[in-house]
């Protein structure tokens, strides 16, 4: 059994859930991140217990690897089982969002109450696009393996999806992410390339649990994606691709509103 490194956060002492085991919030970070990225939001959602997970190749799971989405989904299930988590809401950002969708659609997700995705890509619809993305990700992976990490990160954060960042914010992210292990990042990047990811929209539309899609109002790529596929979109003000970092208070408020609304819905009303 492979279990991922994680940190548990108990509910606030005054929370009605403090003495009673209720659904957990399980948080999955993006590429180059760690479970700690979610700490400000998780603390603001302190009425719920939280599990902050380090994905393979990241944080305290740096020595772990994964052989694609199905393997990561299995590792997630085993981690939840090892931590005694029977009911949970699953939240993921970017790469973590893609893993969360896959797990909800295809994994062993007994106990899943609902899904929150921030800026997660649903996949690519044809083989030509998938092959092109594989080549692109392999080139990035080669750089992560061979070049000094700060040098690669300088270019990584120049990608169009990070266009909302100013030079100071880019510099802060490069410094923050420079403690990653380049070869481990490369392995995870290749294992979870969009070129390997199935097209998730049809399965997502068939989910029998509620889900929502969160996106910064400056994240034009994923705003367009959510609108194109008519996802249940909620936007975060003054935020780009990493909305939970830019505006944790507004993000936490959206999470809590979704949980409150979804928990009140009868099973027949789980429309998305």
UniProtKB/Swiss-Prot annotation:
Catalyzes a proton abstraction reaction that results in 2,5-elimination of pyruvate from 2-succinyl-5-enolpyruvyl-6-hydroxy-3-cyclohexene-1-carboxylate (SEPHCHC) and the formation of 2-succinyl-6-hydroxy-2,4-cyclohexadiene-1-carboxylate (SHCHC). It catalyses: 5-enolpyruvoyl-6-hydroxy-2-succinyl-cyclohex-3-ene-1-carboxylate = (1R,6R)-6-hydroxy-2-succinyl-cyclohexa-2,4-diene-1-carboxylate + pyruvate. The gene is menH. GO terms for molecular function: 2-succinyl-6-hydroxy-2,4-cyclohexadiene-1-carboxylate synthase activity. Its EC number is 4.2.99.20. Monomer. Belongs to the AB hydrolase superfamily. MenH family. This is 2-succinyl-6-hydroxy-2,4-cyclohexadiene-1-carboxylate synthase. The keyword Chaperone does not apply. Coiled coil: none annotated. It comes from the Bacteria. It comes from Yersinia pseudotuberculosis serotype IB (strain PB1/+). Keywords: Lyase, Menaquinone biosynthesis.
